[in-house]
Amino acid sequence: MFKSIREEIQGIIERGPAVRGWLEVVVAYPSFWVMRYHRVAHWLWKRRLRVLARWIMQMARWGTGIEIHPGATIGERFFIDHGMGVVIGEMAEIGDDVTLYHGVTLGGVAPSIDSD
């Protein structure tokens, strides 16, 4: 678990152009915190503790402005730079070493009006 956290911090340092060090990541990067919440919530989701998992992610959303469904599958070293408005749905599958920016929505499965 701690190795994963260290790798995630290192990934943010490498891909975040404004990051000055690990302490700044831990104190000031919402991406780091939303992923801490998501890892716990996803574990709970897989064990069918779904209301608790949803509640944890709602708290994370209020604190970070980033909305991630606890059922979403997210790989290692995931980084959201300027995460306000990011929405990741239940069906999203994100691999390792992925970076997202503000305003991205992933995971919708229902077709929109007038879509092909």
What is each residue range found by the language model?
Residues 1-64:
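Terminal amphipathic alpha-helical/low-complexity segments used for targeting or macromolecular assembly
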Residues 46-116:
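Flexible, glycine/small-residue-enriched loop-and-beta-strand segment within the central core
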